[in-house]
Regions:
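Extended, largely alpha-helical regulatory/partner-binding modules appended to the mid-to-C-terminal parts
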Residues: 86-90, 108, 121, 173-174, ...
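P-loop/Walker A NTP-binding region and its immediately flanking N-terminal helices
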Residues: 1-174, 184, 192
Length: 369
């Protein structure tokens, strides 16, 4: 049903297909259309938001043989475009700095820069996870950025710009990528599903989008996994995704919150342990609890808020969440949220993983009496 992984199969081939990074796309396309190409770009932002994709699009656009003056989109038909799309262009060099971080790797790169492009106008170097370069390697790269050959373009991509040396940052045009919104991810997934002729229920799609945490690549990878897990069973339901990812069911969280809000420590602890016996880890349960308590806190402040978690709920579940927000004092919500946030770290080091949660339950129930 699906031959290539979805995030590769549907990787944008034009700037107009890129979602969520309009500010970056507009600046780059203006520069390409006006032939104002910089020798070095720095793409910073969360994983899976399009940094490498835009680096490849830039490489295609500047080297496209059919692109006319004033245009910015690659044709995707000429020899240079096709080779980049297929991943076998001699003039697009991609380097993973996580595994090629030493000074010898950068020296090898510097030696390669001296040679003119084999077919294209520019030789484009994409250095992914650039913050992982060693100090010596970063300094060696800096010298190249200071005096680059006219045929070379560098695209440095990083998820942790604070680890980059300031002198490298200052020599690049910097673009900050943002996390994608839930609705942007859903729109993209719907387009893919339409082309793949696969049906997924809306709540299931919303859950996938919220679990991706702003990363379109993570969303597409998760969708791929869900399709494989579901087989021929369609439409794919929300429950399938919850089972696959080990997500705590909403009704389980709501029942636990009922005991917590009513200050029934005995029932809350008993329910917690019975739930964990079914295979959930304390970490999974605690994380889900934090997510829902945060949502209740935000609803207490503004009942009209539409956060990612809310979008994945049914109308009945939304009303239940609002009911918790309405009947629970804000001080109690804050107290519970703070305790379970502290518990998150304690679980990792506890010889009895659920013990920190049990202690938090007792403390919350006693304090709110």
């Amino acid at each position: 049903m699906v031959n290539l992984v979805l995030y590769r199969k549907y990787r944008p081939k034009t700037f107009n297909e890129v979602i969520g990074q309009e500010h970056v796309v507009q600046t780059l396309t203006n520069a390409i259309g006006n032939e104002l190409i910089s020798h070095a770009y720095l793409f910073s932002g969360p994983r899976g938001t399009g940094k490498t994709t835009l680096g490849r699009l830039l490489a295609k656009a500047v080297n496209c043989k059919n692109r006319k003056a004033g245009e910015y989109e690659p044709c995707n038909q000429c020899e240079n475009c096709l080779e980049i799309n297929q991943g076998n262009s001699m003039d697009l060099i991609e380097i993973d700095a996580a595994s090629n971080r030493g000074i010898d790797d950068i020296r090898e790169l510097k030696d390669g820069i001296k040679f003119i492009p084999s077919k294209a106008k520019y030789k484009v170097f994409i250095i992914d996870e650039a913050h992982q370069l060693s100090k010596d390697a970063a300094n060696a790269l800096l010298k190249t950025l200071e005096e680059p050959p006219s045929h070379a373009i560098f695209v440095l991509a990083t998820t942790e710009i604070h680890k980059m040396i300031p002198t490298i940052i200052s020599r690049c045009q910097r673009f900050d990528f943002r996390k994608l919104r839930i609705e942007e991810i859903i729109k993209r997934l719907e387009l893919i599903l339409e082309k793949e002729k696969i049906k997924v229920e809306k709540p299931a799609l919303q859950l996938i989008a919220s679990q991706a945490e702003g990363s379109i690549r993570d969303a597409e990878s998760l969708l791929d996994e869900v399709i494989s897990f579901s087989g021929e069973s369609q439409p794919i339901k929300k429950e399938v995704i919850e089972k696959l990812l080990g997500i705590v069911e909403v009704k389980v969280i709501f029942q636990f919150l009922e005991y917590l809000v009513s200050k029934n420590a005995k029932m809350a602890i008993s329910f917690l342990n019975k739930t964990l016996e079914r295979g959930l880890s304390p970490h999974q349960f605690n994380k889900a609890l934090i997510d829902y308590l945060r949502e209740i806190l935000l609803l207490k402040i503004d009942s009209e808020l539409e956060n990612p978690l809310i979008l994945g709920l049914t109308e009945e579940e939304k009303e239940k969440l609002k009911e918790f927000a309405f009947k629970t004092p804000i001080e109690d919500i804050q107290e519970a949220l703070q305790k379970f946030v502290e518990t998150e770290n304690q679980i990792k080091y506890s010889s009895i993983p659920q013990l920190p949660m049990e202690l938090a339950i007792v403390e919350i129930c006693e304090k709110t009496e």
